[in-house]
Amino acid sequence: MEIKVGNIPQLKWAGDALAIGLFEDAIKLTEDAIELTEEMAELDEMLSGTLSELIKETEFKGKANSSVSTRVGIKTSIRKIIVVGLGKLEKFKLDSLRQAAATCGRLAKKERCKTLGISLPMCQDADSTAIAITEGIELALHQDNRFKSEPENLGPDLEKVELIGLAASDEAIAHARKICSGVIFARELVAAPANSCTPITMAETAQTLAKEFGLTLEILEKEDCEKLGMGAFLGVAQGSDLPPKFIHVTYKPEVTPRRKLAIVGKGLTFDSGGLNLKVSGSGIEMMKIDMGGAGTTFGTIKAIAQLKPDVEVHFISAVTENMVSGHAIHPGDFLTASNGKIIEVNNTDAEGRLTLADALVFAEKLGVDAIIDLATLTGACVVALGNDIAGLWSPNDNLAAEITAAAEKAGEKMWRMPLEEKYFEGLKAMHADMKNTGPRPGGAITAALFLKQFVKNTPWAHLDIAGPVWVDTENGYNNQGATGYGVRTLVNWILS
């Protein structure tokens, strides 16, 4: 699909479908007529009143993400007109554009259009507007048919999209498409079943990325991890027949980096719960998504490798399965992490934090300026914030503010949560330094406090993405399935 800036005025554009946006408060209906803006009135006149008739007959109100469409007369340069609601003007932001563009793209494809002109109002500046619209279109139209013997025939592909009347640069569109390639890469990793996405294939994927983009790659095998004392990670891994892979990919700019960062993604390619087996109704069949943090990490690798910022970034994932076997760790076992902390495993289904513990210790030893970890870590976070919002924990206000700003720009919802030190009392063990789980209340907070024990001095933040990593139904520019949540936030943070 080609996406480009169209310098042609709205009234002179020719193609299959023209999509326009209307604010909720901009439509004034009377019994006899509709009051339109000057530009809309000119378009309506060109279409012989089709636009005003469509709005009136459908009682279109301009509510966010609502849409209507109709064919127009054969004497015009377009076949169809699409009207998408932008909601209230005072709530209009970049993500409103993404949502509107997604609605336009899906409807144009449903209407079997091959060319689409999009005329939406500007937000912030022309390039930011172009980036948001491009992201909305690209992500909404992504289809993952890898595992279907006969992919559904969803109609012809949209071949060309023009952003009409927008003085944006081609570089802005290229920038957005590079980011989208990372989001889609993450989506497809997370959506793949556990017999397709394994620790071995994740390592192979890292090798492919490193080779394609000239990145530095280090893969630590089980023996290497043993030498580094990664007892927490290896304790989880010992129940699986598949070998664990500790993956470290480094992007280094050609110039002296202005900053060194680390991103750590939880990489459980399948989580059975271990001997604390997940029971019926627990969603065990969905535990392929427990490598969502690693999926986001890998997606960010792909985007950053193409964008080439002047920042050095280390991408780390301790990848394994959490399985049931005669070799699996027992509830009550003690594990020694690579910083010497001894952990009592009181629940084998709280394994992600064990793998992250050694990964965080490894990351800090690299001498980076800041660390972010991402993980589908707790159901408690989903209970607290729902399926759309990730939890953010950090003892560093500046880092938390940076991440929050990056997420706002990306339209990825996030909420800062407390690191209540008093709650660590619930993690204290009788004969070890700590347990891996605490009391049920505040479970997402105690999980973050557990991770905090493995970062000494480096600014650090933890993102619990258990909710937004997956959607069961189409939602905005996210299709049913894996969302690639976090890639755009991380890219914005790295570039900031």
From Swiss-Prot:
UniProt xrefs under SUPFAM superfamilies: Macro domain-like, Zn-dependent exopeptidases
Domain of life: Bacteria
Keywords assigned by UniProt, alphabetized: Aminopeptidase, Cytoplasm, Hydrolase, Manganese, Metal-binding, Protease
One example of a Gene Ontology biological process annotation: proteolysis
Cofactor: binding details: Binds 2 manganese ions per subunit.
Protein location: Cytoplasm
Signal peptide: none
Broad class of enzyme this protein falls into: hydrolase
Cofactor or coenzyme needed: Mn(2+)
Active site, UniProt feature: 278, 353
Residues reported to bind Mn(2+) 1: 271, 349, 351
Protein family membership: Belongs to the peptidase M17 family.
Function: Presumably involved in the processing and regular turnover of intracellular proteins. Catalyzes the removal of unsubstituted N-terminal amino acids from various peptides.
UniProt name for this protein: Probable cytosol aminopeptidase
Gene expressing this chain: pepA
